[in-house]
């Protein structure tokens, strides 16, 4: 039996709704007390890149959660789901900090693809070990990127710095859980 081609509806923005999109990412003319608008917006721009990196990480973790197979399935499947939740919390914290700094966060898929800093996740259905080896690399990338923002902008705003320090600590812990599955018992992954 041949399946029929499904035609899905396509949303088209017209008139007034189209005009609304022109100002979608308009920034405020203010920021938090103690920072200049320029400094607040500079910090928020760096946070936007971290927002995008963490959005991608959350999508990768959920994708692997759905596609992991093999003897470690249930342990890894459940671990990844809890990690998705934690990374999504980080995304929300960063977006809210950006808004507080007066910049509209952009978590839309088009922006994610346009500004991505890592290659497309190459695995579909695969073993836990294969997924975890790749996820470890994506965690390393995100941890390094958080550290770069801290190095360049941490001194400008201690509040954003604290947020990124706490997230980096948690990302390192989540990566430790991944690496515990990869460790050969001699401390090698």
Curated annotation (Swiss-Prot):
Top-level taxon: Bacteria
Subunit organization: Hexamer.
Any one GO MF annotation of this record: ferric iron binding
Taxonomic source organism: Haemophilus ducreyi (strain 35000HP / ATCC 700724)
Name listed for the protein in its UniProt record: Fine tangled pili major subunit
Keyword Nucleus among record annotations: no
Location of this chain's protein in the cell: Fimbrium
UniProt family annotation: Belongs to the Dps family.
Keywords from the UniProt entry: Fimbrium
């Amino acid at each position: 039996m041949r399946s029929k081609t499904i035609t899905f509806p396509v949303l088209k923005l017209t008139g007034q709704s189209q005009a609304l999109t022109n100002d979608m990412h308009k920034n405020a003319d203010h920021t938090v007390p103690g920072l200049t608008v320029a400094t607040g917006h500079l910090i928020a721009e760096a946070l936007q890149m971290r927002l995008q990196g963490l959005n991608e990480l959350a999508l990768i973790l959920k994708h692997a959660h759905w596609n992991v197979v093999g003897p470690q399935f249930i342990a890894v499947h459940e671990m990844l789901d809890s990690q998705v939740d934690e990374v999504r919390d980080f995304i929300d914290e960063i977006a809210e900090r950006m808004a507080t700094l007066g910049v509209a966060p952009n978590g839309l898929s088009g922006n994610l693809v346009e500004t991505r800093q890592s290659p497309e996740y190459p695995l579909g259905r695969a073993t836990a070990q294969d997924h975890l080896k790749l996820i470890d690399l994506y965690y390393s990338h995100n941890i390094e990127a958080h550290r770069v923002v801290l190095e360049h902008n941490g001194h400008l705003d201690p509040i954003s710095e604290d947020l990124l320090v706490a997230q980096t600590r948690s990302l390192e812990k989540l990566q430790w859980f991944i690496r515990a599955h990869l460790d050969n018992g001699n401390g090698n992954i």
